[in-house]
């Protein structure tokens, strides 16, 4: 049985639960219980505060954890990064009052900066030879300049709307963060086998993200040109149709290039284009 530590609420919690659900790992979250066992996979989920997850994994309380990179780097716990998960993306940035002219990092020399991430901020300032007064607070960091508690803030930024609503502007991006799957360095071989099965499922789900399964009818005489346009996984599937001179072509397209490629296919005579979502993809 593997124990995985997960944030107990918030965006990271929601996206983690969605990932486990897509991997067909059933976890009941209907009751506010700290430890919940999956009904169909040898895993149990321990719900914790995000800043407690790195320590719980490093100390062996949990075998795995899904945590924001920002918290993992800040805590400096001795755990292994197993996989970058690509969701709950944000950045840690320095922000100052919007009406202040910003000449560069030298502006922060001797200034008071409010933050919940003093370790990351100090490392950044030390690398750049800046001496600032780091003021540690938890929660509502963005109000600090407005109540004269600090000259600037160092905090998580997602959309930037919180900064705008507090009359602040982002001036330096210090690090970019996303969800990480971290693991204890001393897992047993039995637990590693379960981890490998978990990773197999996660990778199948992640591989299918932003991908579409596309079927189309294509004139056989243009097949070579059509296949050259398609950036399929290996080679598209081509099957002759009952109507002479036509073939059915099946492939997988990246959603980011979908409309660009579909336009080229139509110009080459493709018809009856059917687009389907992909839940999982085994590579």
UniProtKB/Swiss-Prot annotation:
Coiled coil: none
Class in the EC hierarchy, top level: transferase
Gene Ontology CC terms: cytoplasm
Pathway named in the protein's UniProt entry: Amino-acid biosynthesis; L-histidine biosynthesis; L-histidine from 5-phospho-alpha-D-ribose 1-diphosphate: step 1/9
Cofactor needs: Mg(2+)
Chief subcellular location: cytoplasm
Catalytic reaction annotation: 1-(5-phospho-beta-D-ribosyl)-ATP + diphosphate = 5-phospho-alpha-D-ribose 1-diphosphate + ATP
UniProt GO molecular function: ATP binding; ATP phosphoribosyltransferase activity; magnesium ion binding
UniProt keyword annotations, A-Z: Amino-acid biosynthesis, ATP-binding, Cytoplasm, Glycosyltransferase, Histidine biosynthesis, Magnesium, Metal-binding, Nucleotide-binding, Transferase
Activity regulation, short description: Feedback inhibited by histidine.
Enzyme Commission number, as recorded: 2.4.2.17
SUPFAM superfamilies reported in the protein's UniProt record: GlnB-like (SSF54913), Periplasmic binding protein-like II (SSF53850)
Annotated localization: Cytoplasm
GO biological process: L-histidine biosynthetic process
Pfam families assigned to the protein according to its UniProt record, in alphabetical order: HisG (PF01634), HisG_C (PF08029)
Function: Catalyzes the condensation of ATP and 5-phosphoribose 1-diphosphate to form N'-(5'-phosphoribosyl)-ATP (PR-ATP). Has a crucial role in the pathway because the rate of histidine biosynthesis seems to be controlled primarily by regulation of HisG enzymatic activity.
UniProt similarity note: Belongs to the ATP phosphoribosyltransferase family. Long subfamily.
Entries under PANTHER family matching the protein: ATP PHOSPHORIBOSYLTRANSFERASE (PTHR21403:SF8), ATP PHOSPHORIBOSYLTRANSFERASE ATP-PRTASE (PTHR21403)
Protein name: ATP phosphoribosyltransferase
